[in-house]
Regions:
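Cofactor-binding beta-sheet edge motifs in enzyme active sites
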Residues: 2-27, 39-738
Length: 738
């Protein structure tokens, strides 16, 4: 077992207090906490349940409630995180209740859904939470029975003393435990003793989801609630000049039409807000249909922004042709040097063979199935907001600053989200809802249509990369050069593989400014790097006459045994481990004859994933028969959820690589709904996905995003085998609806 110190201060892991009617309550400062569940039918609720932010409650009947500060976005933290607490508490899973906590930054240090952080950053705190409660219950029993605490054991929510034969349920000792001082040290279980962690548990919201129970932001309703929508400029690079709402206000059910300003000239308040528009027009009415119709009757005049605009973005109306030209020009010049090993110029000069390729990817829209929406009820001295957001803590600050209210007077409640993928990290719609409610002096739900969301959203940046490799006369890789950039940011990870495995290495970055709003998109940067890098490495392996898996393994062996440089931010052994496993599980060496197979491996968010994609040609069209996935994400808390996330990432990655792309004409997206923006269809998904996890005792690492990037590279390499052509530009199939 592991002995750990508890930390007791204002933002400490654990606080203790007594519950009304008896019970033990522990509150935590979890970096990325627990989840919510329905009450098990076997469990009778205690008489005096009450809730506080970030706590574990034990009722006098043995029931356990764990509050979840983290937003639930489909990553299954509402199931997996309480499993960690329950295991260390040593309670039967059927006695666990979990509820969504309200936002409270006085208790929680981080309330965020993003960066694949929930389990990996919450792991230790969650374990300590359960272990501390268990220790206090053991101490209470030892005091009651007048025996040493080391003689008290637990199992499934029951305390035992073998010597006397005494036993008691947790509920019987909860009140006594609440009177004890929190221990300075607690014992954590040995990994081999886990009984809940590592077992598959169903999604606690599963029944509610499939039966249509109100869980999501669009489900949220309250008495007297009005509906609002936004009229945006017809293009990025424009601003409001004037508007005439006479006809719109005369429409049935319309309450008001007015301009709103949400921009704040403070980066700390504004970082999670869109920064492309400073003033918008709000339409408010009784129903969505009435507001949509009134919106069509608005007469709005817009004008171009000037070079000295408040937003600090370039003026002008941008088009895809201009974007591509600017990126190509930037890529043709030396960039900002981010890493240099050896003498890459000399290596390329003396190379027997040089391979050079260019890769590009367009802007992409997130397109979660639930469009942006948020509820706000703003009073003179208090604001209640509720809805789907990945960053409630940061948006609380933005809303408070914009409304001029103290932070403690803003209450943000989190609903389940119908998808996010990074889109809901940016809360402009939340600020807009608050400003509209303040103006109306009434509860309001702001709703974006699909066209609103796609036309005025936050996009995955456009990217462009130049890769070069130098081979000597013996086909050894002696030089590697990557020059990578984008609009408006570079996705370059200069210290990741193959850095550290090549003697002569150069990584450069560049950027092109834009007035189009961009931001995080599932596995930021990596969602382009993986397909470009892994496609290029496949070509280099082919040019060297080497098996693509063995070629990568040879490089990783060098990085592991004799690394170049000291700033390599990946574990070469874990990287090689997923490649070895996927080679074995896919039968790469024994079962590849006659198959069109592609392989790729990638590292991000502290996890490692390798894929093999099998493609068949049917009537001249590629059909994805099977995808193999090998995943090293450390200890797998909930295998069923882990498989689901991996499978979903694979389907999502294939769809975006094949079909998804957003182009612009004079500042406006050419694709504004699913009739123009292609997503993967059921018949195009892999017929079979086989997922394997590397077993180890490493603390959990990320999983919501790591399985997404590599499958795109494996797909590109499999398509090459099937079609005989390389795929350098995404989407591989243009926006076709044939």
């Amino acid at each position: 077992m592991t002995i750990v110190k508890t930390k007791l201060n204002r933002r400490s892991f654990i606080r203790s207090s007594a519950l009304a009617g008896g019970g033990l309550l522990l509150t935590f400062s979890w970096l990325a906490p627990a989840c919510t569940t329905d009450s098990p039918k076997e469990l009778t609720m205690p008489d005096n349940w009450y809730e506080l932010n970030g706590f574990l409650k034990i009722g006098n009947n043995g029931a356990v409630t764990i509050m979840s500060p983290n937003p639930e976005i489909g990553q299954n933290v509402k199931t997996s995180m309480p499993m960690i607490v329950a295991d260390e508490l040593d309670v039967d899973w059927k006695f666990v209740l979990v509820e969504q906590a309200p936002l409270n930054t006085d208790i929680f240090t981080r309330q965020l859904a993003g960066g694949s952080q929930s389990i990996r950053q919450g792991w230790n705190g969650l374990r300590m939470a359960g272990a501390t409660a268990r220790r206090m219950l053991r101490e209470a029993a030892a005091h009651e029975w007048k025996v040493p605490v080391d003689e008290i054991t637990t199992e499934a929510g029951v305390l035992y003393h073998k010597g006397s034969g005494k036993e008691a349920g947790y509920g019987e000792m909860a009140s006594a435990a609440a009177e004890l001082t929190v221990p300075e040290e607690v014992e954590l279980k040995d990994i081999k003793d886990f009984t809940i962690i590592g077992t598959s548990r169903k999604n606690v919201d599963g029944q509610k989801i499939v039966t249509g129970k109100p869980l999501f932001g669009l489900d949220y309703k309250t008495e007297g609630m009005l509906i609002a929508m936004i009229e945006h400029p017809p293009a990025f690079g424009m601003k409001l000049k004037s508007f005439d709402a006479t006809e719109a206000k005369a429409m049935p059910g319309i309450k008001d039409v007015f301009a709103i300003k949400t921009y704040q000239d403070d980066y700390q308040m504004q970082w999670s807000d869109v920064t492309s528009f400073t003033e918008l027009v709000a339409i408010v009415g009784n129903s969505t249909w009435e507001v949509m119709n009134a919106k069509l009757m608005l007469n709005v005049e817009w004008e171009p922004i000037t070079a000295d605009n408040t937003l600090g973005v370039p003026a002008g109306f941008e088009s895809t042709a201009d974007h591509n030209k600017k990126m190509a020009e930037a890529a043709a010049k030396p960039g900002r040097e981010q890493r240099r090993d050896g003498n890459p110029e000399e290596a390329f000069k003396n190379a027997a063979k040089v391979i050079e390729r260019t890769y590009t990817a367009p802007f992409q829209a997130h397109n979660p199935m639930e469009p942006m929406n948020f509820f706000a009820d703003v009073k003179d001295d208090f604001a209640l907001l509720a809805g789907p957001t990945q960053t409630p803590e940061f948006m609380e600050k933005s809303v408070a600053a914009r409304l001029g209210l103290p932070l403690e007077k803003v209450d943000v409640q989190m609903t389940r989200m119908g998808g996010g993928f990074g889109r809901r990290l940016y809360g402009h719609f939340m600020v807009e809802a608050a400003v509209i409610s303040q103006q109306m002096k009434a509860p309001v739900k702001l709703i974006y249509s699909r066209e609103d969301d796609m036309s005025y959203g936050i996009y995955r940046p456009a990217y462009h990369a130049l890769y070069r490799a130098a081979l000597d006369a013996d086909n050894n890789l002696i030089g590697f050069h990557v020059r990578m950039g984008g609009i408006p940011e570079s996705p370059l990870h200069a210290n990741r593989f193959p850095a550290g495995s090549v003697d002569n290495y150069l990584a450069e970055s560049w950027t092109v400014d834009s007035n189009i709003s961009t931001g995080a998109f599932r596995a930021p940067g990596s969602n382009f790097n993986a397909v470009a890098e892994q496609s290029f490495l496949d070509e280099v392996a082919e040019a060297a006459g080497k098996d693509p898996i063995q070629f990568r393994l040879d490089l990783l062996k060098r990085a592991q045994e004799n690394p170049v440089g000291s700033n390599n931010d990946y574990d070469a052994a874990r990287y090689a481990g997923v490649l070895e496993q996927v080679r074995e599980k896919s039968g790469w060496d024994t079962n590849s004859e006659g198959k069109n197979r592609g392989v790729a491996a990638y590292f991000c968010h502290n996890s490692y994933v390798a894929n093999v994609v099998d493609i068949a040609n049917k009537d001249g069209n590629p059909v994805i028969e099977k995808v193999y996935a090998s995943v090293d994400c450390g200890i797998v808390v909930n295998p069923d959820a882990a498989v689901n996330m991996t499978e979903g990432s694979i389907v999502d990655g294939i769809g975006h690589a094949m079909y998804s792309g957003l182009t612009f004409s004079e500042g406006y997206p050419d694709q504004t709904n699913f009739d123009m923006y292609r997503l993967i269809r059921h018949g195009e998904a892999p017929k079979e996905i086989e997922v394997h996890f590397v077993e180890n005792n490493i603390d959990p690492t990320g999983l919501g995003e790591p399985p997404y990037p590599p499958v795109m590279g494996a797909l590109a390499n499999a398509l090459y085998k099937a079609k005989g052509e390389r795929y350098y530009h995404q989407p591989f199939v243009k926006n076709s609806f044939e």
